[in-house]
Amino acid sequence: LTVNAMAMAEDGRLIDPYGGFEDLKKGVLRHVSAAFEEDPLRVLRVSRFRAKLPWFRIAEETKAMLRRMVESGEVDALVPERVTAEIRKALKEANPSIFFDELEANGFIARVYPEWKQTDFSRGLLDRLASGFTEEEKFAASVASVDPDKLLNLLESLRMPKKLTEFAQLFSESLRDGFENAADGKSVLSVLRRKDALRRPERFAQLLRLLKAAHRIDSDEKWLTSVEAVRSLDFRSISESATDKSRIPQLIEEASVRAIDETLDKLTDQH
């Protein structure tokens, strides 16, 4: 890019053979020469630059070149791990949704990841998460609008770390399964087990935080206190006191449901 092709001479003179300073003043991202096409990873890097500096725009001739690089199949040869690395960097930028907008505009998404659709919901959520949220949360937001039937195929092709793909699947499921409507001890316990909340309470708390950011739940209090109520039970004591050992699972189930019901009653009284 012309803005990256400037240098300062020892005597303080600006060395600017391609007009980078003028492009910098105007906020324009412009390629230097036809050699730009030699590295198809630049399709992603320029898009990421836009997400980092949203007040810049891509020059029309550079946009055309990016589209040619996609249409010619140059991007098909990209090593998936290099693509994944660029995506992960883009998720850390100030306006990550712009990265995906640019990749849609130049045809990269349609050609390489046709399942990866963005909507106003996923774009808005992604940008709300730009500051103070984790990589898992941002990646989950970026695939929030993907058809659930196509999500696994997309995740496999992206080759993201396991913790990112698992959390993305959990969030996608939680957007659609109506879990938030659980209102009594038995149904809440079923949700906690389905979300693996009792074994992985930190991840569940992270999920709730993201669901609040997505305006899917108003509060996480019911869920966090229910997790704490069950995890604080003395399962060993329950097991040891059972005269019929075959009933231990049922006794634990009943104690867990009771603990959650008591918690829900307290919350109702408080509010």
Pin down the residues of each PLM region.
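C-terminal subdomains that position terminal phosphate/3'-OH groups for nucleotidyl transfer/ligation
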Residues: 102, 115-271
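Glycine- and charge-enriched loop/helix tracts that form the active or gating conduit
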Residues: 1-160, 271
